[in-house]
A protein has these predicted regions:
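Active-site-proximal beta-strand/loop segments in catalytic clefts of secreted hydrolases
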Residues: 1-4, 37-41, 65-70, 77-81, ...
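Substrate-binding/access-modulating region of protease and related hydrolase catalytic domains
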Residues: 1-61, 84-87, 104-120
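Sec-exported extracytoplasmic/periplasmic mature domains
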Residues: 25-32, 39, 67, 128-135, ...
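Subtilisin-like serine protease catalytic core
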Residues: 29-31, 58-61, 82-89, 132-145, ...
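Secreted peptidase-domain scaffold signal
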Residues: 39, 173-175, 180-229
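Hydrolase catalytic cores
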Residues: 94-172
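Long, low-complexity serine/threonine/glycine- and acidic-rich segments characteristic of extracellular
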Residues: 202-302
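Selective detector of the "anchor" transmembrane alpha-helix that sits immediately C-terminal
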Residues: 305-322
Length: 322
């Protein structure tokens, strides 16, 4: 979905409450995989380019797509988050600059166009291939695959005054690339390998505070005793790490893992999967959490949510001990 708009606007009402944003959420709730343009409103502003995600790209459930140049750098025009209700958008980034598109006004019927309206059809095409690989793919599975398997992109401040850091405390997703750069081949392979007889769940809550080297526990089902399968956990864009089987029968019904030390504090996402082989992988369990530098003692699960006061101010999130 794209409105074809390209102008600079600062938003205070891009909270997903507009009629068309709510309609896009309803489309996803009906089981239809949906991709939306982030918008082309970042412009060249030094600060105000943040919070320029346009409606309906601010809808919560669809995948909102940012645009990359041909060199895979983030396009200067591509709108950045946050939304005005402080959600992280976009969700993913793919190439949208200098794309050949139909144009009846030209001699050969084509012209070069740039915008998130060019990036979004590419992401929709990737989604179509994923559905071809797995006709039963759900919108939530689609989003979890993008979140877990996108190529990690580091935010880099360039000399260009229009490129600024809109993601003060975000690591994955961030408000410029989302979960990262689309990886079409991996997305399609993973979609085709989903085995719903395999399941995994982490014992953590959304936005739980997680200390350095915290222990994460969880449950899994679908593996027989002594099988070659395993539970794997990934923090942000790091590599998948194998958990420890804590079950009595060697079937991973109970598992744990002590997280590797993290370098970047702030909001990120922890992913878990039950892996049997390349053709049989469980749906992803994904949880947004808050990483802090304090080292966990006795491999505890992390601080209780009430031990920190989360203060929201504009696009900033401050963690204050209480």
């Amino acid at each position: 979905s794209s409105l074809g708009e390209q102008q600079f606007e600062i938003h205070v009402d891009n909270d997903g409450s507009s009629a068309w944003s709510r309609q896009m959420d309803a489309v996803v709730e009906a089981g239809i995989i949906t991709t939306l343009s982030a918008g082309n409103e970042f412009g060249g502003a030094t600060f105000a380019g943040c919070n320029t995600i346009d409606s309906p790209g601010d809808a919560a459930l669809p995948i909102t797509v940012a645009s990359l140049d041909k060199d895979l750098g983030l396009a200067i025009y591509s709108s950045r988050g946050y939304t005005s209700d402080l959600r992280v958008k976009p969700d993913v980034a793919t190439i949208g600059s200098s794309i050949m598109a139909p144009d009846a006004a030209t001699n050969d019927g084509y012209t070069s166009k740039s915008g998130t309206s060019m990036a979004t059809p590419l992401m929709a095409g990737i989604a179509a291939l994923m559905v071809q690989a797995n006709p039963d793919l759900t919108p939530s599975e689609f989003k979890d695959i993008i979140a877990a398997y996108s190529i990690e992109r580091e935010i880099v401040l360039l000399d260009d005054p229009g490129f600024n850091d809109c993601s003060v405390v975000e690591t994955r997703p961030d408000n410029e690339f989302g979960y990262g750069q689309a990886d079409p081949i991996v997305f399609v392979e993973v979609a085709g390998s989903i085995d719903r007889s395999l399941n995994v769940t982490m014992d953590i809550d959304t936005l739980q505070v997680i200390q350095n080297r915290s222990q994460i526990t969880g449950i899994a089902s679908g593996l027989s005793s002594g099988s070659e399968g395993r539970v794997e956990v990934r923090v942000g864009g790091a590599e998948w790490s194998e958990a420890k089987d804590e079950s009595n029968d060697g079937d991973w019904t109970s598992w744990s893992i002590v997280l590797e030390p993290h370098n970047n504090s702030g909001n990120t996402t922890i992913f878990a999967r039950l892996y049997l082989d390349d053709d049989h992988i469980s749906p992803i369990d994904a949880k947004r959490v808050i990483l802090i530098d304090e080292v966990a003692t006795n491999q505890e699960k992390g601080l209780n949510e009430e031990s920190l006061l989360i203060v929201l101010f504009g696009a900033l999130i401050f963690l204050v001990p209480v």
